[in-house]
Amino acid sequence: REVEARARDAGLPVPEIVYEVVDHRELNAIAALGGFPVRYAHWRFGMEYDRLQKGHAWGLQRIYELVVNTRPVLAYLLRHNAPVEQKLVMAHVCGHADFFRANAWFAHTDRSMLDVMAAHAARVRELSAAHGQDALEGFIDRVQSLDNLVDPGSLRLARGHPGNAPPLDGRLAPGDVLGHVLRDAPLPDWQREVLALLRDEACYFLPQLLTKVMNEGWASFWHSRLMTGSLLRDAEVVDYACQHSGAMGGSDGPMNPYKLGLELFRHVHAHSGGGLHAVFDARAVHDDLTFVD
């Protein structure tokens, strides 16, 4: 708990975190399921696991941790991280945990989603037995192809309408395609129920898609402050510098959200005139689009 204590001393209000230490296969399997090992089974999750495993085996990528937005926050740590890596990762986790707690886009997410996912998986198994695996899997394929087409304004609605009850008429935004299909499409009852379950999950994951740069930037901002401020021993400085620079390094591939988010938060801290107060205010109200703008 030393890392959390140092984080709180530095001004970061860290909520309760439960840590699980796993090997790389277990971590890749959990990551493929979006952080929920109790989630329903589907071939796309298996395909994602295979991609993560091959990336790890070929040295193309490595997951050091996985943080899940629940209450308490659930953090999966890689068993074979070196001591300085584990310290860095735990400082990084503290940033994620605070971001989930404080950012406005997460205000209406369901923090009991671990139990909800388990209930969804049980119901999907029942429907698969009743209607056939091929029919169910084919329908889930179609829903998953649209699962980013939910509206941020629908997050609160999703909390209030579990199971197969559709949202209220007249309260759906045009961009909430899954919501409109759920309400208006002539679907059999079992398909409507599956759609409602998957839409609830899509609404849960939506804030993470909208704040990827900010979330990773906030975690990186705090791991760098904590590690260089009080957590590092003299003998660990070089190892930390190698780990940090590896995570922040640029490439010819996709944008690095860790680097971009870190530099944006450092810019706010250095140039806004508000110091840490301005940084905390920024992390509370923005998504990636408004933050970059």
What label would you give each PLM region?
Residues R1-V73, P166-A185, D189:
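Auxiliary, metal-adjacent structural segments of Zn-dependent hydrolase domains
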Residues E2, R6, V93, A97, ...:
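Generic, well-ordered alpha-helical scaffold segments in large soluble proteins
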Residues V18-N28, R111-S112, V116, A241-G246:
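Acidic helix-start/capping segments at beta-turn-to-alpha-helix junctions
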Residues L52, P72-V89, L206-M214:
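Short pre-active-site segment immediately N-terminal to the catalytic Zn-binding motif
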Residues P83-L88, D115, A235-Q243:
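Alpha-helical scaffolds flanking conserved acidic
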Residues G95-A158, A219-D234, S245-M255:
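Post-HExxH zinc-binding segment in Zn-dependent metallohydrolases
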Residues L149-V213, G217, W222:
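Internal metal/ion-chelating core segments
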Residues E236-D293:
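Non-catalytic terminal regions of proteins
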